[in-house]
């Protein structure tokens, strides 16, 4: 068992300050902020501190049961009330690491450690010097990468001659590393000797230089993290229950400690420019021009335009198109008094210029108890939607998939459904990252297009075109390793795509409840897992399983999700049309791998482009029982039969990512069922993303 004190300081600075920047129109009326300009000891560039956060914690651990917990005792930050989410995002970027691991993860990419077992394959090492550090004889070894464009470092370290433990180390990312928006990564670590064989970390410093351009003269941002460790104590036992993580650890006092608290616990005094940040930002918030710039930045980041107590948006969903509605105009908004609101309401209105119909929706949620995060939620929506765009149902009352209104599509996008959905549910989190949900819903479904049918034969053999269905759904979701920010009814996930997810759901169709038509049972399971494959990049895998018990029509079955947009949508089958395959029993597998430029980096004329290799594989097996096939009626009021992928449908893709740092293009190839009418053997899709 062990415990120690931890003091952490995060800082963001505007760098490469010159007269052109100071006199630019952007900072007109805000010239006073440049009184705090300083010079970096690492890069030699000038910088202006813009943001600082301090945190003091007690860390407790037990190596026997392999558990550790960090108790935050104080947190202080400059700037705005929404800074906490920003702080948590930055902390995730600067996650703790162990230099002895084979790969060190920064900005969601894995660098090969110079102390890795495989380091000899990617680094050259040179013995430079030897000397006493304290009373320990140490060797000074420099290292540098064997090849360009790989995720590697250069630097040196001092290692003890008897224990081979590192006493000091610095790491500087290779300038040619395939990394976006980052010009520089520099790390220093120092260790002290506890006894003859144990070295404990005492200081960890990391600087990152972010910029849209790699040129040294370009303006950018420094992100700096300085961490001190002190007061190590050992063999102080704690009960295993002590290490249980709190679901909602927020305490008001922790974020409002007096100045005396910080004077007593800071392990390094603030510099003059760091002290000035707190006062400068308080003044900056009163400058009208800065308020305007902040509003524009918030709009780009969140997609919402902020008013007092209300946000309009999201602005990126204002325009859409499908063959039923034609051009679609959507306006929406949400209540928003702060990121930790205990309740929130959302709504929207939409109009299709082709069908001349108005659609709308309203939802609300309230955090009724912070203990175990008990939430009540519900809503109503009347809309046009592309159902069957995913295998695992979400029942998000205001959620609308990208397939419903893609501006550019492939083939006929007319298999749309007119839906009226009402939901009421309860959710709780009895254990951290383990949520339980019970949801009641009622849907009315009918075809929104004359060229698509959801009709079916009822028990009397009559044809019905409208389906009414009440359901009760139980669901559990487990997301180990998920990190969130906030303590209100909504929390922001700050490490999305970095943790596995397990979902298990059971749905009971309630016949005759609110004139519901069918009685049935549905079981669904979903497992997603990201994998860091060392120097070979990053892999994402998904497995979905489902089974329906009972006789139900097309509107309630499980169509295999096609993709007729030109966007790459994960967990869909790009070369399938909507409703090409329908099932009541299914198993699907998705794999997508990003090599991170590992292969292109070895080709001289491609190396400078920093492109990244993408490959994917998708497969699905499914069955459709005879009762669930023969119940359906086509647009001509005659029986219609649907095909299921009993011979495992599959497709694969290969592409290039990081084009202009934001664009990925994938070429998709259909593997079988090549004799189906109107199929697409080959397709091209794209995606936009901001990633390191």
Question: What kind of region is each of these model predictions?
Answer:
Residues 1-138, 144-152, 213-313, 317-320, ...:
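Structured extracytoplasmic
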Residues 1-2, 98, 134-136, 150, ...:
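Edge/loop elements at the starts and ends of beta-strands within beta-rich repeat scaffolds
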């Amino acid at each position: 068992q062990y415990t120690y004190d931890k003091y952490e300081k995060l800082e963001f600075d505007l760098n490469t300050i010159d007269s052109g920047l100071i006199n630019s129109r952007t900072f007109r009326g805000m010239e006073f902020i440049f009184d705090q300009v300083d010079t970096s000891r690492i890069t030699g560039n000038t910088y202006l501190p813009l943001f600082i956060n301090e945190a003091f914690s007690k860390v407790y651990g037990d190596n026997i049961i392999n558990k550790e917990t960090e108790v935050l005792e104080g947190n202080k930050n400059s700037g705005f009330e929404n800074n906490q989410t920003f702080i948590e995002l930055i902390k995730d970027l600067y996650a703790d690491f162990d230099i002895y691991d084979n790969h060190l993860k920064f900005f969601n990419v894995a660098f090969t450690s110079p102390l890795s077992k495989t380091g000899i394959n990617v680094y050259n090492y040179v013995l430079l010097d030897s000397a006493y550090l304290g009373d320990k004889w140490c060797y000074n070894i420099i290292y540098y990468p064997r090849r360009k464009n790989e995720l590697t470092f250069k630097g040196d370290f001092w290692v003890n001659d008897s224990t081979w433990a590192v006493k000091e180390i610095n790491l500087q990312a290779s300038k040619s590393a395939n990394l976006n928006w980052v010009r520089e990564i520099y790390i220093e670590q120092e260790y002290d000797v506890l006894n003859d064989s144990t070295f404990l970390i005492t200081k960890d410093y990391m600087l990152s230089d972010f910029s849209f351009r790699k040129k040294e003269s370009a303006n950018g941002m420094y992100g700096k993290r300085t961490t001190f460790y002190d007061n190590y104590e050992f063999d102080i036992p704690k009960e295993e229950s002590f290490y249980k993580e709190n679901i909602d650890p927020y305490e008001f006092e922790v974020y409002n400690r007096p100045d005396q608290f910080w004077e007593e616990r800071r392990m390094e005094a603030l510099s003059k420019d760091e002290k000035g940040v707190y006062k400068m930002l308080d003044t900056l918030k009163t400058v009208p021009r800065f308020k305007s710039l902040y509003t524009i930045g918030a709009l780009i980041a969140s997609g919402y335009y902020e008013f007092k107590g209300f946000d309009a948006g999201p602005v990126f969903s204002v325009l859409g198109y499908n063959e039923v509605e034609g051009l679609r105009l959507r306006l929406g908004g949400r209540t928003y008094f702060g990121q930790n609101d205990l309740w929130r309401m959302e709504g929207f209105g939409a109009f299709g210029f082709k069908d001349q119909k108005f659609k709308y929706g309203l939802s609300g949620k309230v955090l009724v108890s912070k203990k175990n995060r008990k939430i009540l939620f519900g809503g109503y929506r009347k809309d046009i939607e592309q159902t069957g765009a995913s295998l695992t149902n979400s029942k998000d009352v205001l959620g609308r998939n990208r397939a419903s209104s893609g501006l550019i599509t492939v083939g006929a996008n007319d298999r749309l459904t007119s839906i009226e959905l009402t939901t009421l549910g309860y959710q709780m989190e009895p254990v951290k990252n383990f949520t339980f949900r019970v949801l009641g819903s009622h849907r009315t479904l009918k075809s929104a297009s004359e060229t698509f049918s959801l009709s079916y034969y009822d028990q009397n053999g009559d044809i019905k075109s409208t389906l009414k269905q009440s359901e009760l759904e139980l669901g559990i979701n487990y997301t180990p390793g998920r990190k969130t920010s906030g303590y209100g009814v909504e929390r922001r996930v700050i490490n999305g795509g970095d943790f596995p997810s397990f979902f298990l759901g059971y749905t009971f169709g309630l016949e005759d409840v609110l004139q519901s038509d069918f009685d049935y049972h549905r079981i669904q399971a979903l497992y997603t897992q990201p994998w860091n494959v060392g120097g070979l990049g990053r892999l994402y895998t998904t497995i979905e399983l489902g089974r329906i018990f009972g006789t139900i029509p097309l509107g309630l079955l499980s169509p295999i999700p096609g993709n007729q947009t030109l966007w790459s949508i994960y967990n869909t089958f790009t070369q399938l049309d909507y409703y090409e395959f329908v099932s009541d029993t299914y198993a699907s597998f998705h794999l997508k791998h990003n090599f991170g430029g590992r292969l292109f980096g070895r080709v001289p004329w491609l190396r400078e482009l920093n492109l990244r290799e993408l490959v994917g594989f998708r497969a699905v097996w499914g069955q459709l029982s005879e009762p669930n096939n023969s119940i359906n009626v086509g647009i001509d009021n005659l029986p219609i039969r649907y095909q299921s992928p009993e011979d495992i449908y599959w497709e694969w893709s290969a592409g290039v990512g990081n084009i202009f740092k934001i664009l990925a293009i994938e070429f998709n190839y259909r593997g079988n069922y090549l004799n189906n009418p109107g199929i697409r053997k080959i397709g091209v899709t794209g995606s936009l993303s901001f990633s390191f």
